[in-house]
């Protein structure tokens, strides 16, 4: 029998018989590992431990101590949910039930359930876990599988598409329950130590709105009850900080079904924050030698064909028919910037050329994936594009990373960094890739940045450095990026005249400091829990007159503080209620103004952190706030140490 080469994570090659399973290889490495094997990761894909190896592969054995074990456990938990559902609702029809980053979901139809029904389903699931049912894999003839699902068009659709070329398909059974599934799964339902159902939402089959509407039930699972409790507590904290909740409380933004899903409407308070964010990044760009440009929201599709986006992204684009000519809302800003560069003749002395734009883009995400500001159809990217000589790459990337680090420091955000290298399919020669990767890695080393190398995870057009924000709850969000691009200059035939009087191809660098304004707005809202630093806060100071007689004096103070965002609470409330409301509204500074303050020409200041008041001179307060805003401090500091 022929053999295949299995390469282990440490690089060790093993010659095994073709058709050997993941579990067979584990036993060949050692009997203890074989006994502990739960699944395998074959060429990056999580598979069942009984999966046959028919070609040379890279293999990682998954045990209970592996990160991937949680995915396997949650996949089995999805089946436990489905079994519990069918025990309680015999008409329930199952579609798909994958694991996710935080748990699992299962899309169902045939029954009408809501959040109130989850408790009973969860209780039945706990019974199934208590029964400790063996989970067994069975290979079934594909035609037989069609017969088993003669009343389930969704499973038949899977058999006709994903399994179209398979003679046999796998089913997993536990007790009376069975499901068409590729796996992998744990050995028994009793391995699930903590199980919870979380929420219900609507979904569409295959994620397409024209298909059947389904009910999606989300859940999670852990090896222990303690781990589940910790997750649920973290989830509770996250719900308290949910930017959608805070956005409504603070009148920051809204999303209205009348205007369309994934199309946020920024209210005055939200727009004030956006303006500050935009001014901040514009200042950084100008200081770094960028020129601001502007491109339209829509282009003829000829541009998108030239850039390659039409070929690769057309399904995610919003297309328009204008006088029998096709246009597309822009999904990215880079083709417009490349076109601007294309308008001029450039010498090697002119480079680098740096453009920036707060450019609105549009991407047709699946409706079920839209969520607040984290996933939208319309969003704004603080896009920067640099056109550089190959010998300028390292210097420009270093300067860009410096700006990114300054930005993260300004907002007091921790971060992680990934360095993504050349994928199997790529454009550009070996020499330029090797040099570019070396230059990017050199920048990270020079900045003493801890990073993870993601082998083969770069874009097809160049390597990249990705930063991920870490918020106050330890969650990670996509953030700044620096990407080299050898492809677009080629597609647009961009060039500059070199010192040798010959035409040369520049390298394009894509760069964003926030990623997108929408996601960054979301991250900041949840990171600060709505308590924005004074320089960002939509309302920086609220004046609280003790009585209506003090309103005129408050108006005079408002005029003196006209460089700041100041409001007057003129409702006929008690001072205590006014203070409490200002705290609830997360206003950084509150100034109580009564007869004593008016007679003395002072104000009584308190901040949202300190619960005591200090009588001070208006000019002193103004001077401090000017410093606090100019230095973009992340906390209220006026009363600290006074």
UniProtKB/Swiss-Prot annotation:
Highest taxon listed in the record's lineage: Archaea
Required cofactor names: Zn(2+)
Annotated SUPFAM superfamilies: Class II aaRS ABD-related (SSF52954), Class II aaRS and biotin synthetases (SSF55681), TGS-like (SSF81271), ThrRS/AlaRS common domain (SSF55186)
Domain TGS stretches: 1-63
EC number: 6.1.1.3
EC supergroup of this enzyme: ligase
Cofactor mode of binding and number, as noted: Binds 1 zinc ion per subunit.
SMART domains assigned to the protein according to its UniProt record, in alphabetical order: tRNA_SAD
Keyword field: Aminoacyl-tRNA synthetase, ATP-binding, Cytoplasm, Ligase, Metal-binding, Nucleotide-binding, Protein biosynthesis, RNA-binding, tRNA-binding, Zinc
Main localisation: cytoplasm
One GO location term (cellular component): cytoplasm
Protein localization: Cytoplasm
Positions bound to Zn(2+): 334, 385, 510
UniProt xrefs under PANTHER family: THREONINE--TRNA LIGASE, CHLOROPLASTIC_MITOCHONDRIAL 2, THREONINE-TRNA LIGASE
Family membership noted in the UniProt record: Belongs to the class-II aminoacyl-tRNA synthetase family.
Role summary: Catalyzes the attachment of threonine to tRNA(Thr) in a two-step reaction: L-threonine is first activated by ATP to form Thr-AMP and then transferred to the acceptor end of tRNA(Thr).
Protein name: Threonine--tRNA ligase
Organism of derivation: Haloarcula marismortui (strain ATCC 43049 / DSM 3752 / JCM 8966 / VKM B-1809) (Halobacterium marismortui)
Gene: thrS
């Amino acid at each position: 029998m022929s053999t295949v080469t299995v390469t282990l994570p440490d690089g060790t090659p093993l010659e095994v018989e073709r058709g050997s399973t993941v579990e067979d290889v584990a036993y060949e490495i050692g009997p203890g590992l074989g006994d502990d094997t739960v699944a395998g990761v074959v060429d990056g894909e999580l598979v069942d431990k009984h999966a046959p190896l028919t070609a040379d592969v890279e293999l990682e054995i998954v045990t209970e101590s592996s990160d991937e074990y949680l995915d396997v456990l949650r996949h089995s938990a999805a089946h436990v949910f489905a079994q519990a559902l069918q025990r309680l609702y015999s008409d329930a029809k199952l579609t798909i039930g994958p694991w996710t980053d935080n748990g699992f979901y299962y899309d169902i139809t045939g029954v009408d359930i809501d959040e109130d029904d989850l408790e009973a389903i969860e209780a039945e699931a706990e019974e199934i876990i208590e029964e400790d049912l063996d989970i067994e894999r069975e290979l079934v003839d594909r035609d037989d599988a069609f017969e088993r699902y003669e009343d389930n068009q969704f499973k038949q659709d899977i058999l006709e598409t994903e399994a179209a070329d398979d003679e046999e398909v796998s089913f997993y059974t536990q007790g009376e329950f069975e499901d068409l599934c590729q796996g992998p799964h744990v050995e028994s339902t009793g391995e699930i130590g903590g199980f919870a159902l979380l929420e219900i939402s609507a979904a569409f089959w295959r994620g397409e709105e024209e298909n059947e509407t389904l009910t999606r039930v989300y859940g999670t699972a852990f090896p222990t009850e303690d781990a589940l409790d910790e997750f649920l507590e973290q989830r509770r904290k996250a719900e308290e900080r949910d930017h959608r909740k805070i956005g409504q409380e603070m009148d920051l933004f809204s999303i209205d079904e009348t205007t369309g899903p994934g199309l946020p409407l920024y209210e005055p308070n939200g727009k004030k924050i956006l303006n500050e964010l935009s001014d901040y990044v514009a200042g950084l760009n100008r200081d770094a030698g960028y020129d601001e440009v502007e491109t339209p929201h829509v282009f003829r599709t000829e541009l998108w064909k030239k850039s390659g986006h039409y070929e690769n992204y057309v399904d995610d684009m919003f297309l328009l028919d204008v006088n029998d000519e096709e246009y597309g809302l822009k999904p990215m800003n880079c083709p417009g910037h490349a076109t601007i560069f294309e308008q001029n003749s450039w010498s090697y002395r002119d480079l680098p050329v740096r453009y920036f734009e707060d450019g609105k883009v549009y991407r047709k995400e699946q409706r079920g994936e839209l969520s607040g500001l984290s996933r939208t159809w319309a969003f704004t990217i603080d896009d920067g594009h640099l056109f550089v000589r190959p010998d300028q790459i390292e210097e420009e990337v270093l300067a860009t990373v410096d700006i990114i680090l300054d930005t993260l420091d300004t907002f007091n955000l921790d971060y992680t960094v990934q360095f993504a290298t050349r994928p199997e399919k790529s454009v550009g020669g070996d020499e330029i890739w090797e040099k570019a990767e070396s230059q990017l890695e050199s920048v990270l080393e020079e900045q003493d940045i801890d990073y993870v190398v993601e082998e083969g995870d770069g874009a097809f057009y160049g390597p990249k450095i990705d930063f991920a924000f870490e918020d106050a709850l330890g969650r990670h969000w996509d953030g700044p990026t620096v990407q080299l691009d050898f492809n677009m200059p080629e597609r647009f035939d961009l060039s500059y005249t070199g010192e040798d009087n010959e035409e040369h191809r520049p390298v394009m660098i894509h760069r964003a400091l926030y990623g997108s304004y929408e996601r960054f707005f979301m991250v900041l809202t949840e990171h600060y829990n709505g308590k924005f630093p004074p320089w960002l806060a939509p309302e920086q100071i609220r004046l609280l007159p003790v009585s209506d007689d003090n309103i005129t004096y408050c108006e005079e103070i408002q005029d003196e503080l006209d460089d700041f965002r100041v409001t007057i609470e003129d409702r006929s409330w008690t001072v205590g209620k006014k203070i409490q409301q200002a705290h609830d509204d997360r206003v950084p500074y509150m100034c109580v103004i009564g007869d004593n303050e008016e007679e003395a020409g002072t104000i009584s200041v308190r901040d949202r952190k300190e619960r005591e008041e200090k009588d001070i001179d208006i000019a002193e307060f103004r001077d401090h706030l000017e410093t606090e805003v100019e230095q973009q401090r992340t906390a209220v500091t006026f009363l600290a140490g006074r």
